[in-house]
Amino acid sequence: MTHVMIDLETMGQSALAPIASIGAVLFDPHGDWIGDSFHIHVDLNSCVGWWGMQMDPETVLWWLGQSEAARQALIAGQVRAASLSEALSALSRFLPTSVTPWCNGASFDFAILATAYRLVKKPLPWEFRKERDLRTLKGLNPDLRVERDGVHHNALDDARHQARLVQHILQFNPDLDS
């Protein structure tokens, strides 16, 4: 079975948060393979103006305090951003038919994606029962770390880092089933 790590960059914290970008990588949680990747910027005007998603001022202010590289990637991405519907269709096309999705926190990324797919009237491209949560693994292994590559709060860089963290944690916990 193929696994995918998904990360979102958003302009809010609720299930209706506008999605600024989506990053995803295919990976083997019990090995060291990280495969094909996906990265797309989402037009915030599409999220808010067309689909009624809700910007959170606290999150916008939080973004202003992030690194120059993260802020510039977010701004530059809006120039070539896809509509929410186009971005979700592209993510669905990227994912294998039978996939186990992961994210850092099940109550954040998965909730926002489920809401977004529902808004654009597209089916969720995975079975919700297969959703996996990195935050739980990190809680069981709080001292395990992986060297960070890339830009913090870049959806693709974060997805790669999170996939490597799952692999690292499961190497030290071979009895855990993913």
Residue map of PLM features:
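Active-site catalytic microenvironments for nucleophilic, acid-base chemistry
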Residues: 116-120, 140, 168-172
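Acidic, Mg2+-coordinating catalytic module of metal-dependent nucleases/exonucleases
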Residues: 100-107, 111-112, 144-178
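Anionic group-transfer/hydrolysis microenvironments
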Residues: 9-11, 25, 105-106, 111, ...
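Substrate-recognition/cap helix-loop segment adjacent to the acidic, metal-dependent catalytic center
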Residues: 90-95, 107-128
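Short, flexible loop segments at boundaries between secondary-structure elements
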Residues: 125-145
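Hydrophobic positions within alpha-helical membrane elements
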Residues: 12-14, 138, 163
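Conserved non-catalytic scaffold segment of RNase H-like nuclease domains
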Residues: 2-4, 9-103, 149
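Short, contiguous clusters of charged residues that form electrostatic/catalytic patches at enzyme active sites
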Residues: 85-89, 135, 160, 164
